[in-house]
Amino acid sequence: MKILADENMPYVEQLFGDLGTIEAVNGRTLTSEQVKDADVLLVRSVTKVNQALLSLNTNLKFVGSATIGTDHIDQSYLASQGIPFTNAPGCNATAVGEFAFIAMLELAKRFDTELKGKVVGIVGAGNTGSAVAKCLEAYGVEVLLNDPLIEADDPRTFVSLEALTERADVISLHVPLTKDGAHKTWYLFDEQRLQNLKPDTWLLNCCRGEVIDNRALIKIKAQRPDIKLVLDVWEGEPEPMLELVPFVELATPHIAGYSLEGKARGTYMLYQKLMAVLGIDADKSMTSLLPTLWSQQVSLDELPSEKALLQLSRFVYDLRDDDELFRKTLLDDSSIKAGENSANNNGFDLMRKNHKHRREFSALKLASAGQSDVDWLLNLGFSGVGR
């Protein structure tokens, strides 16, 4: 069996190596010629899987995408050819949730304010949006949810997008990218909606770049410096609008979901599904793939301080490092060839490929001899909190 896998997908050899020959490929430049002899195709969001890509293949038995979203997959075509497909819903939800939470803590520190006491609106209450809400609610932050696609069958309380933008001090976007329908999300935040944001709004996008009209965002930010931006996704990836970057407080190259746990979870979910398709028992465990937990003795009595919580979060992941690398890579004049977007030269994709996958809060095992109520730290995701 020939297994074609994105070169940036971890643990493929450990999980799929017994099944056949594995060939690692560049997912963004994958061609029909490369795919023609594959029995299994494992991709990420940078690969568009459609009739054109699969036109030379008559042997494909399975397509798996280690992603939450599926807008890069022509599922109708796969179904018409009888090719089983699965993605990995929720695989990196915890990573995205913690990324957004840490970004909010960083903004609070930078602008000498407190996250606790603000109202946070979450647009899109699926796996990733719910993970953000989980962190915020564990910390005691008021959360508003907007998701017209699920609210009819979901017991949680929802508000309209208009009500959310009127009330929320912070807005975090977690929707799939859809171009059609009553609830399309392409340019959901267009020039008018951006202009109508309340003063001093923090706007975070960790889903798809085109959910915000980036050209309009440049225009609005020039007029409204009070709006603070955190962008992990960009219109036109892997060539973001470089003129937007200086307007962004925290800028990263679509790596919000890049935790070691999240990446392992995504690959493992594809492994489980393929084994089911093949009728073979999945006898490998995900926990065996991951390094052991870190241990850290901390004074939990100090953690009610938001700055102390930020320091603990930075021990797991310091978002400022990725922001600095992003700016250095894409805006460093010495790296820009005349007449070319620097993303083409040293780029966006290279940062993603070489990203050192961070750990999630659960990788940090805390211990304390103090008497503080620490249940909220367990709810936030940290491991082994005890006395």
From Swiss-Prot:
Which reaction(s) does its UniProt entry say it catalyses? 4-phospho-D-erythronate + NAD(+) = (R)-3-hydroxy-2-oxo-4-phosphooxybutanoate + NADH + H(+)
The answer to whether UniProt assigns keyword Cytoplasm to this entry is: yes
Q: What is this protein called?
A: Erythronate-4-phosphate dehydrogenase
Q: How does it assemble?
A: Homodimer.
Q: List the disulfide bonds.
A: none
| Organism in which the protein naturally occurs | Shewanella sediminis (strain HAW-EB3)
Record EC number: 1.1.1.290
* Enzyme active site: 208, 237, 254
> What processes in GO biological process is this protein linked to?
pyridoxine biosynthetic process
Question: Which pathway or pathways does this protein act in?
Answer: Cofactor biosynthesis; pyridoxine 5'-phosphate biosynthesis; pyridoxine 5'-phosphate from D-erythrose 4-phosphate: step 2/5
GO function terms (MF aspect): 4-phosphoerythronate dehydrogenase activity; glyoxylate reductase (NADPH) activity; hydroxypyruvate reductase [NAD(P)H] activity; NAD binding; protein dimerization activity
Q: Which amino acids does the record list as binding NAD(+)?
A: 147, 232, 257
Q: Where does substrate bind?
A: 45, 67, 258
The record's section on InterPro entries has: D-isomer_2-hydroxyacid_DH (IPR050223), D-isomer_2_OHA_DH_cat_dom (IPR006139), D-isomer_DH_CS (IPR029753), D-isomer_DH_NAD-bd (IPR006140), Erythronate-4-P_DHase (IPR020921), Erythronate-4-P_DHase_dimer (IPR024531), NAD(P)-bd_dom_sf (IPR036291), PdxB_dimer_sf (IPR038251)
Q: According to its UniProt record, where is this protein mainly located?
A: cytoplasm
UniProt keyword Calcium, yes or no: no
Q: What class of enzyme is it?
A: oxidoreductase
Subcellular location(s): the record lists: Cytoplasm
GO terms under cellular component: cytosol
